């Protein structure tokens, strides 16, 4: 949970859990889409770590006044959940190896409703 990740961050870098909760909430908010561990495919990878830096800046200042590198905090989160830092390709490879028919359909026409303005 984000709280447990925040407590882990405190053990590594000091401060209070509230210093880190926004970052860890951000990684895990994708649970709203899937409700299970598969949410990790959306942010728990090397690109997600870069996105975290873009969102939170290069450092997060903790309550002790220390600037903690966002990259290290994000890597901590991903490593705690995945055991290593996967790339997006690591997740996509699994999809490619088990592609569903709807994923392979090319050129299928979609129906678009015509907008009429009175």
Give short role names for the model-derived ranges.
Residues 1-118:
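N-terminal membrane-targeting hydrophobic helices
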């Amino acid at each position: 949970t984000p709280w447990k990740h925040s407590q882990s961050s405190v053990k590594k870098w000091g401060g209070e859990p509230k210093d880190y909760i926004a970052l860890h909430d951000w990684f895990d908010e994708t649970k709203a889409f899937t409700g299970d561990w598969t949410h990790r495919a959306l942010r728990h990878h090397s690109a997600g770590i870069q996105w975290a830096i873009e969102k939170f800046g290069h450092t997060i200042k903790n309550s002790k006044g220390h600037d903690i590198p966002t990259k290290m905090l994000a890597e901590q989160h991903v490593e705690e959940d995945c055991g290593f830092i996967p790339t997006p390709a690591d997740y996509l490879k699994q999809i490619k190896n088990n592609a569903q028919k709807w994923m392979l359909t090319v050129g299928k026409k979609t129906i678009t409703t015509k907008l009429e303005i009175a």
